[in-house]
Amino acid sequence: MARQKLTFKEQMDGFPWVQLVVVSLVRFSEPIAFSSLFPYVYFMVRDFNIAPNDAQVSKYSGYLSSSFALCQVISAYHWGRFSEKHGRKITLTCGLIGTSVSLLILGFSRNFYQALVARSLMGLLNGNVGVIRTIIGEIATERKHQALAFSTMPLLFQFGAVVGPMIGGFLVFRDGTMNEVPLWFPHFAKRIIRSYPYALPNVVVCMFLMFGLTNATLFLEETHPAFKDRRDYGLEVGDFIKKNIFGIQPKRRPWQKRIQDDSENIHHRNENVNSIRGQDSEEDENSPLVNTTNDDDTESIQSIDPILTRRQSVGLIRTYSLHEPTDAVHANIDTAPDGCKESSIFHHVFHTKVFYPISVNFIMALHLIVYNEFLPVFLAYDLAVDPENPKKLASKFPWKISGGIGYEPEQTGTLLSTTGIFGCFVVIFIFPIVDRNFDCLTIFRTLVKLYPIMYVMVPYVVFLQNERIPSWYTVVYLYIITGIKTFCGALTSPQIMLLIHNSSPLSCRSVINGATISISASARFIGPLVWGYIMSWSQQNDVAWVSWWSLSLFCMVALYQSYKIAPIDDNENELHGQGSEDAYNSQSQSSDLRMAHRSSLSSLSNQRCTT
């Protein structure tokens, strides 16, 4: 089906800005927490005196990063299951609290093992990335809004990746450095900072997290179809604040409507009870009843005060209940051709159309984490020169490449932070234009082709380190490489999330998102381990291009897999989503009515007792 081109005004019509802003405040705080560690982790591990020498510090720093990713593999799927059973909002708040606790433990750690526990807890106690993806999909229900809504994820990560390193870099006050504690700090704060030099950045990041937690508690609406009508005391407090402080009239909540409707119907229900009681007085109360009640109805009847007769109780339940027998449903459990239950997550992930988007996402996560981790390492290697002629490079074009270009951390940090700002520009200004004119599969397939080219280019920056070549050539060359990566990442990340979202059944969408996060985390755990070995081997054998070219080949697998992803039919997707939503709403309404009539029965019994 041809993609209908929309104007910006048409695409923004009805866009759920308010709820998306609340979710964005939560999402923005999390990459700050994740990236604030990078500037000082080397010095923190070194100060723990766990490494036998400075050369081994990076290995122990890698353990901290790997423990986080490994624990995400373990926990993300279970957080998705938790959100399906208890709702998205409670899962989000638990994740924010868990991250805050783990950051405080990290900041006040006295040894390496405490820091390792803190990083592990950060991975275990937070599955918010997958839950936030689900929330965004349930907030942006119209196809024209989804791509722009999902694009907020990489945008906020880019912003957080700029702010986080600034906090971690400027708020660490270590002895023997130029970064000293400001004179205006209170005396007790100075004592704490001197004892725990890495605590302050973590405390500041916790403030960001608490701000996001407060906003989520007060203003975020539950998006799970089965729980969105459940009473939310946090929202009620938020509505009170909006009305009495900001003068904004909040909308009526579903549970407020239900309570009012119940109170209006009490009078009619009293009349029905009296009518049933009058009819029943003419019959023998010991006579057998027609055996048409199911177990749930029987349980409801038995829970009613004996002041109401059994026949009166049956009349009320039949009048107000939408409950239907479900024995047939439980007896008929479909089994897929793969031998798994059709409702199982294994079936949905590995034997349905969502498999290909998830597999592509795994490859993307792996090669991007390898790039992010090892590009600074490669640039930091000393420039290898010919022992016989120091003015010449030891590398020989095109196959013999050794060493790096001797970049300092400040140079690498400037390079990465600048391209991060460029990524924000891409998401804000370029992404909406691209999304309005092309479908997500076309965008994704086109941009994925650029990754292999970029990785092939990386090792050849060594040959620009020549006296006859101006130094700005190297800067431009590196900005081209990092710019391509940032441009492609900013535009492909929301597309693959959208493809996974729209390929997932609504009934287990949050669980699939949780499984996706676990699979991506496993990629971030495996990638650095494997390519760390490859990079070490290639440097020792003067073939540094092998590590980057192998990464390029791995990207081509993602390109191949992308052609197996089924295109999204916008009309079919919207109809399917609406139908599934209606099914959830129908179940929720049925449950609400059953609870309402049971509450009414209890009230009627109490009224009869008092009379």
From Swiss-Prot:
The chain crosses the membrane at residues 90-110, 153-173, 200-220, 354-372, 414-434, 443-463, 543-563. It is found in: Membrane. It is a multi-pass membrane protein. Residues 261-271 have a biased composition (Basic and acidic residues). GO terms for molecular function: chloride channel activity. It holds the Pfam family MFS_1. GO terms for cellular component: chloride channel complex; fungal-type vacuole membrane. Keywords: Chloride, Chloride channel, Ion channel, Ion transport, Membrane, Phosphoprotein, Transmembrane, Transmembrane helix, Transport. InterPro entries: MFS, MFS_dom, MFS_trans_sf. It comes from the Eukaryota. SUPFAM superfamilies: MFS general substrate transporter (SSF103473). Residues 1-89, 174-199, 373-413, 464-542 are extracellular. Residues 111-152, 221-353, 435-442, 564-611 are cytoplasmic. Belongs to the major facilitator superfamily. Outward-rectifying chloride channel involved in chloride homeostasis. This is Major facilitator superfamily domain-containing protein YCR023C. It comes from Saccharomyces cerevisiae (strain ATCC 204508 / S288c) (Baker's yeast).
